[in-house]
Amino acid sequence: MKLYNLKDHNEQVSFAQAIKQGLGKQQGLFFPLDLPEFELTEIDHLLEQDFVTRSSRILSAFIGEEVPETALKKRVQAAFEFPAPVAKVTDDVSCLELFHGPTLAFKDFGGRFMAQMLAEVAGEQPVTILTATSGDTGAAVAHAFYGLKNVRVVILYPQGKISPLQEKLFCTLGGNIHTVAIDGDFDACQALVKQAFDDQELKDALHLNSANSINISRLLAQICYYFEAVAQLPQEARNQLVISVPSGNFGDLTAGLLAKSLGLPVKRFIAATNANDTVPRFLTSGQWQPHATVATLSNAMDVSQPNNWPRVEELFRRKVWQLKELGHAAVSDETTKDTMRELAELGYISEPHAAIAYRALRDQLQEGEFGLFLGTAHPAKFKESVEAILGQELPLPKALALRAELPLLSHTLPASFGELRKFLMGLPA
């Protein structure tokens, strides 16, 4: 597999290099040089296969001979040990539930596959994973890499801006997992990560690698659950399928669009955001004007400068698709609350991120179409806000109940690269 840097098309790397490097020169994102496509008959055959077999085939279409298919299937099996069920909400709308993994969020798919791939390609070379999280990435990455030989993980997160339960999920592990609460917002955390990757001396000394959705292995893994969703739908739903994706950094939407590019039958996508609406405003006006990040109920989507957007634009350019065909909506906190109550009345308990995707879908779904929205995190991960909004108690899943009792092991730093650099260089080997 060959990939090129979106900021410098002359920089081309292998799949292994892209996983290990994370970003290219000038913090450019890597993008596949070849975009595979399946024939209609191949798609039908894929949709009949089990999740692991199908996913191995999809990933192999991108990765090629760099990872032999038998080794790849073993890695996929180790990564995707949990289901991604489609739950019926109404006659014409279902939810793809991506929260049945160890940290109860969709990021388990990408995080675990990346850990497996890094173990496959890195061999004995020690690696330091440095990533920023607005919630779910941190837990998924921490659990995926916890205890792995030759890997240190450093996770930055905005202090006081993620739910207490989310924090407990990844800040209580210790060992090779180092968590740092930054005095700033998520964009400040991302900026620090980018500065670290721009520091060649630091990068070389620590063999730095990024584990957020800018890493190509995570993105490829996410393609697989879109196929899994369609495989569970009846034929009539497949022909008129609209998918609504709750969007923050836009990795999930990029993966869905790559699935469509492979030949998955999706009529259209909707990018659903909260008040951090840089993309919906851009799609309406043609002006890219990020505002200051606003704190919302759907905190994992509190991103005003989405990292993956250049990949979306590149895919549309390569496929000669029109950006105006991409549905979009920005949903306020008040509407999010109302939608969660509406879903509860339908018998479906949701959380703010999925509720935003449902709202955008419900408002834009046309007669004869079938809607699918992504449930990216278990409602109990947002226990306090969900209980307050719905006025009912949520039982804690076992994974969360166990972590809730443990002490936090985080360090606290100001949003200063100098301080972060000092911390990184002082980490135990």
UniProtKB/Swiss-Prot annotation:
It comes from the Bacteria. Its EC number is 4.2.3.1. The modification N6-(pyridoxal phosphate)lysine is found at K107. It is an enzyme of class 4 (lyase). GO terms for biological process: threonine biosynthetic process. The keyword Metal-binding does not apply. Keywords: Amino-acid biosynthesis, Lyase, Pyridoxal phosphate, Threonine biosynthesis. GO terms for molecular function: pyridoxal phosphate binding; threonine synthase activity. Pathway: Amino-acid biosynthesis; L-threonine biosynthesis; L-threonine from L-aspartate: step 5/5. It catalyses: O-phospho-L-homoserine + H2O = L-threonine + phosphate. Pfam families: PALP, Thr_synth_N. SUPFAM superfamilies: Tryptophan synthase beta subunit-like PLP-dependent enzymes. Its cofactor is pyridoxal 5'-phosphate. Belongs to the threonine synthase family. NCBIfam families: thrC (TIGR00260). Catalyzes the gamma-elimination of phosphate from L-phosphohomoserine and the beta-addition of water to produce L-threonine. This is Threonine synthase. The gene is thrC.
